[in-house]
Amino acid sequence: MIPGEIITKSTEVEINNHHPETVIEVENTGDRPIQVGSHFHFYEANAALDFEREMAYGKHLDIPAGAAVRFEPGDKKEVQLVEYAGKRKIFGFRGMVNGPIDESRVYRPTDENDEYAGVYGDNGDENVNKKGGKRS
């Protein structure tokens, strides 16, 4: 063994295992690239990013710690989000929460095993898929 050496299993490391995912489509409507880091409260991401913000409340990107997703101007892509764990308190970012997560606002699919979760938008005609994103 070498001092400071970390010996890991030869299998892949799973991150956010057993955390329900929410997939949303995001578009950069701004004129500059936007990068969002792994632990950033996605609900509070740059206002030039167009997406269903309420579905991102209490969640961050499902990517390795220290990584980020970059959105070039006009880019449209799907991202996968997971809920914050631990004490579930959010401070800083854009100052929109600054305290405990309001659990009543956190979107959760109703049944991960169904083909569709049966969750509808405010007007009742906006179907979403089991991962929480809009159906096309």
Swiss-Prot record:
This is Urease subunit beta. HAMAP family: Urease_beta. Residues 102-111 have a biased composition (Basic and acidic residues). It is an enzyme of class 3 (hydrolase). Its main location: cytoplasm. Heterotrimer of UreA (gamma), UreB (beta) and UreC (alpha) subunits. Three heterotrimers associate to form the active enzyme. Belongs to the urease beta subunit family. SUPFAM superfamilies: Urease, beta-subunit (SSF51278). It comes from Staphylococcus aureus (strain bovine RF122 / ET3-1). It is found in: Cytoplasm. The keyword Cytoplasm applies. GO terms for biological process: urea catabolic process.
